[in-house]
């Protein structure tokens, strides 16, 4: 197709990070406007409606200010990434394409610290392990960062050292929380 995006790494399509990534950006915008029209028809039976053109971004990558990333063991190593589309197979990633690059850096730093402190990633099959997900938010204007460790239980061995180390690397981190799930 002449509207195919040739620049996108296939890993992003396989992970579902960039569902429309196979389309050139102007075609993505047209697709989204058509989705609105189709939804109005499907939900409300409205057919005679003008839908304005979808407004695009100057740079349609590296814009998301929040990431929720699963933590799993892949080939014996603790990894962060995204699940392969329609599965629970983790695809290790360091560059998440649509996320703020600083968020990607914080996730990689946390991954490395989790490895260093030998904290166990969650294993769905065995229903065991400690760390399920990492959630990182970054203020677009303030640059402040929030980190949330999603764990299976309240106690996290050496969590104080882990927090101290990640804040040393990223002084913009202003809050660290734990979500027990």
Language-model segments: which ranges?
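Accessory RNA-recognition modules of RNA-modification enzymes
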Residues: 1-181
